[in-house]
């Protein structure tokens, strides 16, 4: 346990400011298989198991963010098992294969990456059991090994489920009753060392890893609840109002 944060600390919802609310809603509903939980004028809440994971806010007045500015790197949606992760991944493959950007076996988790239609990064992942994680000198051991997405789908999704996802317009039935959470959020920052001081020294997160210009922090022994990198944003200053990340709860 950290000095300031309890072991039960976890991520809440992520709010995104979007230009095209109907298109973004359709993507998160029909491709990522989230349920629409509430619609209130310019705002739509989507999630799984009754829990809101993503809030979309219609903000067509905002400009598109600069690629090298600070902001969202990705929202990471944690799946309870490999079958549900494979189902979501298969839905992406059927619906929007051009938005897929890569994969990673991180030793603590298996992950697949994509962008939404407005360029907001998304990670879809499943955690290995904590008993399989390795720690060295207080830091979690992670890597970024390739995973073949089609092989993963074939290994963890039945033929019937794959057929359902490829032929049924309402693919969300493949995840009926399935839970999900925002497992972590990864940010683009201008100064990783400054971000580390803020999240660790001020907010009380534990530093769990530093890897290739990225900082990973968590509470309660998790591999990371937040990550910050400078891969595209080194030297970026305060973020100006723009489409993309609104807030993280």
Segments predicted by a language model, with ranges:
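Generic recognition of long tandem-repeat/solenoid scaffolds
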Residues: 45-47, 215-218
């Amino acid at each position: 346990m950290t000095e300031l944060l309890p072991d039960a600390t976890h991520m809440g919802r992520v709010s995104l400011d979007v230009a095209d609310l109907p298109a973004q809603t359709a993507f998160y509903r029909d491709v990522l298989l989230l349920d629409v939980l509430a619609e209130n004028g310019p705002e739509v809440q989507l999630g799984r198991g009754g829990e809101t994971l993503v809030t979309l806010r219609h903000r067509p007045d905002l400009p598109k963010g600069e690629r090298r500015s600070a902001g969202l790197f990705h929202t990471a949606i944690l799946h309870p098992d490999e079958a549900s992760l494979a189902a979501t991944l298969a839905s992406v493959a059927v619906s929007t294969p051009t938005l897929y950007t890569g994969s990673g076996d991180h030793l603590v988790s298996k992950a697949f990456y994509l962008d939404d239609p407005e360029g907001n990064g998304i990670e879809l992942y499943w955690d290995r059991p904590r008993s399989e994680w390795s720690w060295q000198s207080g830091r979690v051991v992670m890597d970024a090994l390739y995973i073949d997405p089609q092989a993963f789908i074939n290994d963890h999704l039945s033929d019937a489920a794959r057929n359902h996802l490829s032929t049924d317009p309402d693919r969300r039935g493949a995840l009926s009753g399935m839970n999900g959470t925002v497992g972590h959020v990864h940010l683009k920052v201008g100064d990783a060392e400054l971000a580390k001081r803020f999240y660790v020294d001020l907010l009380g997160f534990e530093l769990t890893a530093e890897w290739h210009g990225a900082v990973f922090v968590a509470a309660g022994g998790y591999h990371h609840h937040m990550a910050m990198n400078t891969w595209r944003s080194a030297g970026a200053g305060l973020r100006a109002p723009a489409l993309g990340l609104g807030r993280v709860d």
